[in-house]
Regions:
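Divalent metal-dependent hydrolysis catalytic cores, especially in the metallo-beta-lactamase
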Residues: 9-15, 180-184
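Active-site-adjacent structural elements in enzyme catalytic domains
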Residues: 1-7
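Second-shell residues forming the walls of enzyme active-site clefts
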Residues: 34-189
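N-terminal capping/interface segment
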Residues: 21, 33-34
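Aspartate-rich (DDxxD/NDxxD/DxxxD) Mg2+/diphosphate-binding motifs
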Residues: 29
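Surface-exposed helix-capping loop/turn segments at secondary-structure junctions
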Residues: 8-11, 54-56
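Short, conserved phosphate-binding/catalytic loop or strand-edge motifs used
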Residues: 16-26
């Protein structure tokens, strides 16, 4: 892999989002497929290939993009799938990668209200629609708890509106750590 030859040791890929909405501006041309099994198969091969070259993969954008038509760079965006549909799609892909030893994921600024409601039936609207990067329900209860992921969690770009529109940055950074993020992408505070 050329990246290894120039000293790159971490890749923000594979993009394991499932393209279920052709109007999605983020992943409509960046993901493997609309098909869950093909997405998993190609992602596993990508992961195997770059790990053989000494590069750690970070699958993204947990909990999954490709459902809504909004761009998290500019707006809030949820993943509207039911818990059962999420388990059969994004849950299947991430679970397969975790079983194969995926070392890291990139958390997206994407809400997953069905799972928040699963963990807290009395969740407030704010909790239901909190992006994964700021949601303990998604990163701690789902990712680390139910899915048993024990790798590194990096945020998607921390200046994207999907994250910054939720609270002041001075509150957002500790909230992301408390939710379960280990590292920030584009941490550019003075």
């Amino acid at each position: 892999v050329e990246a290894s030859a120039i000293g790159c040791n971490w890749s923000f890929a594979p993009i394991v989002d499932i393209n279920r909405n052709w109007r999605n501006p983020i992943i409509s041309t960046r993901t493997w497929s609309q098909d869950v099994e093909q997405t998993l198969e190609l992602s596993l091969e990508y992961m195997r290939g770059i790990m053989e070259s000494g590069i750690a993969p970070a699958a993204k954008h947990f909990p999954g993009d490709g459902i809504d038509e909004r761009d998290q760079h500019l707006s809030f965006a949820p993943n509207w799938l039911s818990k059962e549909d999420w388990d059969a799609t994004f849950g299947r892909v991430y679970g397969g990668l975790f079983e194969a030893g995926l070392p890291s994921i990139m958390a997206g600024h994407i809400a997953l209200p069905s799972y928040v409601k699963h963990f807290n039936p009395e969740a407030t609207t704010e909790e239901l629609y909190m992006p994964a990067t700021l949601s303990k329900y998604i990163l701690t209860d789902l990712l680390r708890g139910e899915m048993k992921f024990n790798g590194l969690v990096v945020t998607d770009a921390s200046h994207m509106v999907g994250m910054t529109n939720r609270m002041k940055r001075k509150d957002m950074l500790p909230a992301a750590i408390n939710a379960g993020c280990d590292m920030f992408l584009f941490f550019n505070d003075p």
